[in-house]
Every structure is written in C-alpha cells, then in structure tokens.
Amino acid sequence: MFHKTLFSSICVFLLVGFCHSSADGQIGVNAKPAEGAEVLFDGTREMLDQKWTYWKGPRFSSSLPVKWKIVQDPVDRGTVMMTYDPVAAGGKYGTADLVTKMKYEDFRLHVEFLIVKKGGNSGVYLQNRYEIQVLDGDKTKHGMGAVINETPSPYFAYNGVGKWNAYDINFRAARFNGDQRSEKAIVTMFFNGKKVHTNQSINQVWGGPNSGI
C-alpha cells in the first residue's frame, strides 16, 4: 500500500491451504480469526516488524525500519497501522509499499481498512500479482473492491469514508506446468459480509516489480 489516506486494519489474518467457505469462520468488520489462522497484524509494532517488510521494487526509496506508524484507532478502541511514509508523499506509489515476509499460495485473507479522506487510494495485492482495489469514490472497474480492471466495483457494499470496511478473500493461486500457466488464479470475495465475487478468474497480473501488497 502507498502513502494514501488509508488505515490498515487492527487485525489482519490468514488461513493457508485450501480456501474454505465463509461458513468456516467469521467475516466482515470485527471478525475474529478462525481456528488455525495466522494473525499477520494485531495492532502492535512488534508484529509489524516481525511479519512485514518493504517491497523493494524499482521505485523503492525508503529504508528499514518500516516507517508506517502505529496510531490510535480513529473510530474504536485499540491501535491501528497508518499507511504513511514520508518518501511516498504526493502519491508516489511503489516507494514505500509493504509485503509480508512469508510467501503464500492458496489462502483465505481477512483485512480491514478505514479511509479517512475522500479519494483515499490504496490496494490489496495477492502474491504481488493481483490487485483488489481500495479507492474511494470510484465505481468503475478500476474502483473500490474491483479485481482491478477486470470486474465492476461492488461499491454498494462499501461503508464509506471514516468507517471500517472488511475484505474476506478466498484465493486459489494459478497453476503452472513448467513455465506454462495451466489454470488461472481464482478469487471469491466478501465485502463487509456481502458476497461480491464468486470464483472469479483473474486474467491479468497487475503487481510485480512496481507494486507491493
């Protein structure tokens, strides 16, 4: 994510392996981790440093330790992660994005975010390849909740600026025979508890050297 008007969630967690249905755990804002889930962020600086690092693509211009801040939740109790790094000021994407230190194949991901100003823009990258858009005010295929540039924005499910939102993403990675892709990546997603993408094939890679998660 970039220096935008976005707070990342109090709790980010992930189930690795087969992508189970939503019936196997809670979904939506304030969901609790399902049994066996790996918590990726719990509101603490310790976990931020333990499990996250900068994505060192060609535009990277920051340096460790991670400059993103732990701040008080602007809505509820607790602490959250603010997506701010001075080098990314002015929307210079790719200069200070974060990625998990671990790599994952098939998984179910829960992430909560809060946009504090109109037009806030970021994104959730899956495997540094595929982007689920986070963009206030945009209802197009490049807009909020879209598999970017491939599906319409499910903007109807968005809670709006100043409120917490949640993506629950079931992701099945692409399959390959050698260098040839044999099966496309597939995503099913719930946005604030509403099912908005169902077994959606992902055709294009939007991540890579210029982008992070």
Spans of model-derived segments:
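Positively charged n-region of N-terminal signal peptides that target proteins for export
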Residues: 1-5
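Bacterial N-terminal signal peptides
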Residues: 8-17
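Carbohydrate-interacting regions of secretory-pathway proteins
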Residues: 21-213
